[in-house]
Structure formats: C-alpha cells, structure tokens
C-alpha cells in the first residue's frame, strides 16, 4: 500500500491478507496501534519498522548486502579482535544486515541467527536474507533460552535484539550475560547494540562489567545515537593498540569499512573509561 508517512511516494509492505482494509491498516500505522513489524520502501532503500518513530534496519536496494546503518558497521569492529571467528551467534535478525554481511564476507564462519518474532522471520525475503545452508541457520527461538541449552565454544556473540519498547526484556538481566560469558571460548567476545532511551539499558552496562571482570569497552555511534559495547571473555585481555592500527588498515582494504576510524573511537573510549562512566550515570 502507499506509504502514509511519505508525501513524496513510497510504499509499505505488511504481513496481511489481500482482502485486508487498506484504510484500517493506514489508520493503525499512523496511530501506532499496528502490532506487527512492517517494511517501508522508498524506491532506493528498504526499512524495517516496529513503529513509525524508529528504524530497526535499513537496506540500500542497489547494494543489499552492504551495511547501511552506522551502528551495524561498528558492530563489525569485533573483527579487530577476532578476525577469523569459527562460530558466530547473532541474537536478533531484524532486516538481516549483519547476517548478510557476515555470511558473504566470512564464508568460513558458521553462523546461527536467533529471532523470537516469527513475523520478523517472515520478512526475511523482503530483505534478501539468503536461505539456510551449511554455514547459516535462522531459527525462531528466545536468545536466553537458546544459550542455556547450546554448547560452549562461541567465538563471537552479537546481540542486536529489540522489540517495540526497546532492548529485548528477556535479555536485560544478569543471568543472560552470565550465560553468555559461560558459552564463549576463552578468547571469545560479546558485542551488544545499545539503543533507544538510555534509562532502558543504563543498568545493564554495570552488570556486564561485573560479569566480564571489567573487560568491557563501550563506544558511541553518534550518527545513530547508539552505543556499541564490547565485552571480552579473557580476564587479562589487554589490547595491543599499535598492532591493531596495522590490522585496521588491512581490514579496511578487505571489507570496505572504516576500521581505522572504529579503532580510534574504541581506543579513546577505552582510555577514557567510557563504560565505567556510563555505568555510574543517573538518568
């Protein structure tokens, strides 16, 4: 149906039967009572929405396998520390931006993607998420429950899990992060996208720092008003910034992302103790 938000055109893709009332659906979109995720398409980009205020995911139609939103690019900064992950777990499918980038750029990595909303999974074709195969599995599951049952040995755990109210409630607790740490390899790491109202995630920063023995770096994504949090399983992890600067240049050439700029923010945030500062803030 035509987009009710964009006066210059565009359309909305919804998970509704052909006979559904377009006028009723339009009204639900505008007053934010529509309960399912939906897709906005302006002819150049495609967006996943849970409501009209926040973009959950974005895809450029001309480059569907690239990372459009800055926070997704910066979540790939884990490659600075784990450049050849064998096993990657992603909680939160969204529009599949991270799935596609990792699937096509890291062909030797086995990736499992967890999404607890079947309506989000039903939209995977709209975002050109590749079908499941030997190195990719998209599974309808709760991230916390899956971690309880899965085997140890995760190299990188990416968490980009949100609902219409903010960070996924089932993951916003100490038990989840303790379980996450226990399932990582000795040199494994956790990467979390923190977005939305800071009050909804501020307490989690301190929890993660406690669980991961203060081996946490948090850095801003000012373009998207997000933070990316990196937590390291190794209790004596110490970044070699000089070596990482050389690696960042190699990764930029290989993947086309600005890893030197990412590293500069990561190093600055680590030396300023941004994670500890944010954990101590009162909102």
Regions found by a protein language model. Give the residues of each.
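SAM/dcSAM-binding transferase cores
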Residues: 2-43, 47, 55-62, 227-283
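The AdoMet/dcAdoMet-binding core of the Class I SAM-like
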Residues: 3-4, 11, 28-30, 42, ...
